[in-house]
């Protein structure tokens, strides 16, 4: 992101609302457990070592925000299954990126498990920021530009052309 950019005009940024839902460790640990197939309250509690009241409030919040679904079990309506929704599955790359960041920069205990591609049996690559054509981008190659509400595919700004977006980026950097 090279030269400093004025970001005061980004009140509509979605990062604060995402952090409101997922911005504390138990939420991501519950997400990780759900990715690993855990579905029931007791199993989340046993796996994570989380207090019942905290687990209960986090599950309620994750259901309210559409990250998990809450479904009574057919065989016993008193028992509930919590499963990832499409919205929750959309958080998996963020969870993996946070884990990879922690593995690289944290001084905690080393990870004892790898995330592996089932087909190839190889560890996944590091999460990266990719260009539209698949190139890995560095921080100095990125630039925030204003985009009309609800349109974040890059085509909405600058008439949909790469030239228009480059021009907007140059303008944002130069002030």
Mark where each language-model region is.
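N-terminal helix-turn-helix DNA-binding core of bacterial DNA-binding proteins
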Residues: 13-54
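Residue-level detection of the helix-turn-helix DNA-binding "recognition helix"
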Residues: 46, 59-60, 64
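Basic, amphipathic "hinge/linker" alpha-helix immediately C-terminal to the N-terminal HTH DNA-binding motif
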Residues: 23, 74-95
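N-terminal leader segment of winged-helix/HTH proteins
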Residues: 1-22, 157-159, 165-174
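C-terminal regulatory/oligomerization modules of transcriptional regulators
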Residues: 96, 100-175
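Residues within the helices of the helix-turn-helix
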Residues: 42, 60, 80
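Beta-hairpin "wing" of winged helix-turn-helix
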Residues: 63-78
